[in-house]
C-alpha cells in the first residue's frame, strides 16, 4: 500500500512541494479507511486516508465539509485540518490533510472550540441543522447529513 501511495504522490505537487518522501507510517484510529502519517525530507508531514476508488465520494464530501467548517472554527480553540489534495490512482482514492499534532491539545479548550463551532455555524444557517446535500456518517449515506 505504501508503494501505491508513493506512486500516487508523484502526480501531485500540492502534497509534496517537490520534496521526496522520507517515510510512510500507518496510523490507527479508523475502521473505514486506512490512515497514514507521511513524512517528507523537507520536514513537512501530512495525514492521508486511503480506500478503494469506489469510496471517493466519501472523501469528496469530507473535503467539502472540512472546507466549510474551517470558516467557522476559532483557531484559538480548535483546528480544522486544511485539505491538501484528493487523488485517484489506479484502484485507490487518497485524501491528504494537514497534519495536526493532537498531543498538544487540552480537552477543555477543544470542548469550548467545538461549542463555538456549533454556535457560529448555526447562526449562519438559522433554518436547520444538517447539510444542503446528501452526505455520509461513516460509510452510511445520510439524507441532508
Model-assigned labels for residue ranges:
Residues 1-20:
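Juxta-kinase regulatory segment immediately upstream of eukaryotic protein kinase catalytic domains
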Amino acid at each position: 500500500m505504501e508503494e501505491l501511495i508513493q506512486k500516487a504522490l508523484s502526480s501531485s505537487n500540492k502534497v509534496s512541494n517537490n520534496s521526496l518522501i522520507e517515510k510512510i507510517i500507518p496510523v490507527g484510529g479508523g475502521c473505514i479507511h486506512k490512515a497514514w502519517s507521511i513524512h517528507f525530507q523537507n520536514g513537512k508531514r501530512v495525514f492521508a486516508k486511503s480506500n478503494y476508488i469506489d469510496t471517493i465520494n466519501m472523501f469528496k464530501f469530507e473535503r467539502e465539509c472540512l472546507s466549510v467548517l474551517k470558516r467557522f472554527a476559532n483557531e484559538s480553540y480548535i483546528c480544522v485540518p486544511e485539505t491538501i489534495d484528493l487523488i485517484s490512482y489506479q484502484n485507490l482514492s487518497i485524501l491528504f490533510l494537514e497534519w495536526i499534532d493532537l498531543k498538544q491539545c487540552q480537552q477543555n479548550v477543544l470542548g469550548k472550540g467545538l461549542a463555538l463551532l456549533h454556535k457560529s455555524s448555526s447562526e449562519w444557517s438559522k433554518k436547520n441543522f444538517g447539510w444542503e446535500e446528501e452526505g455520509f456518517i461513516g460509510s452510511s449515506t445520510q439524507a441532508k447529513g
